[in-house]
């Protein structure tokens, strides 16, 4: 008997016994993802109050009930995110090993963004309580309770960060002095590299359908980060080519040959040339650099495709990751439409990324 979701298993019955109930709940959640008809109706709205009324007929229900008028886009984003967090916690609180650890890995990406926010705010002497309010709720951690004792980055490192689940990444990659001296985006990418490699190895350890689905998803995420790091580094004097290459995750379709070439690239045209030999990235990169559709949009579209395909599979944990990411894209779509309505830019309203 081989590995199945990290267990010595006897087939789908073992998966169904431990994780089948939660997968069924998740697939029920998935049915509530907005349809193309829902998006068409949202795009017909004249104001945000109309959007509020339309949401009542969707899975979002009356999630904006009680919100005073006029409703703001930030309120819609906050409440939609709150719904996603509630669903995530519902699954996580009932999960057993190894699904519980897999769900924790999902939260670590948001935790990294929160840590970077706290470091940035501390360096600029921002109010700590204000920083916590801006943290993503999926990336909260217990040692945030000790933030009241933080007065500088040394306090943050020694009293907070080393007690987070990210401690192995932080202690393995960053020193206390780095927080004060290193560019904040280098810190973010250093932590994310360690996180992606760890998550990828964990999915390989789980094996089975989890490894199969998550391998494609995480390899794409690694490639996206490598491409973005390269493009964003052009003109950045504090980042040498050698330092840039150290930030690339050690996985992906581009790794190692493509990332080695990216490390030597001088401009966007050279990046485009490097990616020409990779059919996955060739077209949407050329579509997205100087045209109306941004490179970021092309990345989001491919991410949606990979996560949507995860639901064609069964008996693995990929759907749990995919659902969170699809809902996240849905929230971006909702916010985009709401912003277009608020700013009277209805001609751009249809530039959202459909999911199903």
Swiss-Prot record:
Covalent S-S links between cysteines: none
Region forming the signal peptide: none
GO function term, MF aspect, one: proton-transporting ATPase activity, rotational mechanism
Gene Ontology cellular component terms for the protein in this record: contractile vacuolar membrane; early phagosome; endocytic vesicle; lysosomal membrane; phagocytic vesicle; proton-transporting V-type ATPase, V0 domain; vacuolar proton-transporting V-type ATPase complex
Cited InterPro entries: ATPase_csu/dsu_sf, ATPase_V0-cplx_csu/dsu, ATPase_V0-cplx_dsu, V-type_ATPase_csu/dsu, V-type_ATPase_csu/dsu_dom_3
Mitochondrion is among the record's keywords: no
Family: Belongs to the V-ATPase V0D/AC39 subunit family.
Quaternary structure annotation from Swiss-Prot or TrEMBL: V-ATPase is a heteromultimeric enzyme composed of a peripheral catalytic V1 complex (components A to H) attached to an integral membrane V0 proton pore complex (components: a, c, c', c'' and d).
Protein purpose: Subunit of the integral membrane V0 complex of vacuolar ATPase. Vacuolar ATPase is responsible for acidifying a variety of intracellular compartments in eukaryotic cells, thus providing most of the energy required for transport processes in the vacuolar system.
Record protein name field: V-type proton ATPase subunit d
Gene that encodes the chain: vatD-1
């Amino acid at each position: 008997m081989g590995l199945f979701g990290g267990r010595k298993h006897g087939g789908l019955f073992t998966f169904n016994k431990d994780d089948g109930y939660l997968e069924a709940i998740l697939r029920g959640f998935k049915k509530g993802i907005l349809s193309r008809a829902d998006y068409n109706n949202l795009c017909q709205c004249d104001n945000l109050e109309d959007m509020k009324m339309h949401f009542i007929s969707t899975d979002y229900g009356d999630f904006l009930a009680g919100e005073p008028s006029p409703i703001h886009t930030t309120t819609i984003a906050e409440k939609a995110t709150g719904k996603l967090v509630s669903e995530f916690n519902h699954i996580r609180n009932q999960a057993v090993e190894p699904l519980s650890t897999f769900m924790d890995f999902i939260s670590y990406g948001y935790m990294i963004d929160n840590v970077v926010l706290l470091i940035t705010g501390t360096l600029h002497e921002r109010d700590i309580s204000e920083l916590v309010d801006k943290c993503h709720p999926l990336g909260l951690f217990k040692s945030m309770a000790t933030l009241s004792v933080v007065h500088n980055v040394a306090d943050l490192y020694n009293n907070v960060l080393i007690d987070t689940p990210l401690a192995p990444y932080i202690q393995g990659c960053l020193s206390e002095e780095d927080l004060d001296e290193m560019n904040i985006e280098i810190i973010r990418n250093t932590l994310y590299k360690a996180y992606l490699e760890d998550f990828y190895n964990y999915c390989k350890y789980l094996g089975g359908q989890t490894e199969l689905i998550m391998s494609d998803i995480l390899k794409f995420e690694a490639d996206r980060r490598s491409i973005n790091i390269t493009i964003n580094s052009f003109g950045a004097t504090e980042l040498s080519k050698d330092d840039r290459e150290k930030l690339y995750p050690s996985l992906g379709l581009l790794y190692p040959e493509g990332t080695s070439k990216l490390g030597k690239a001088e401009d966007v045209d050279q990046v485009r040339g490097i990616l020409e030999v990779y059919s996955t990235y060739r077209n949407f990169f050329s579509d997205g650099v100087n045209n109306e559709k941004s490179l970021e949009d092309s990345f989001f579209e491919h991410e949606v495709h990979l996560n949507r395909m995860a639901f064609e599979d069964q008996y693995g944990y990929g759907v749990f990751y995919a659902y969170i990411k699809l809902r996240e894209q849905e929230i971006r779509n909702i916010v985009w439409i709401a912003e277009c309505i608020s700013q009277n830019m209805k001609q751009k309203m249809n530039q959202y990324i459909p999911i199903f």
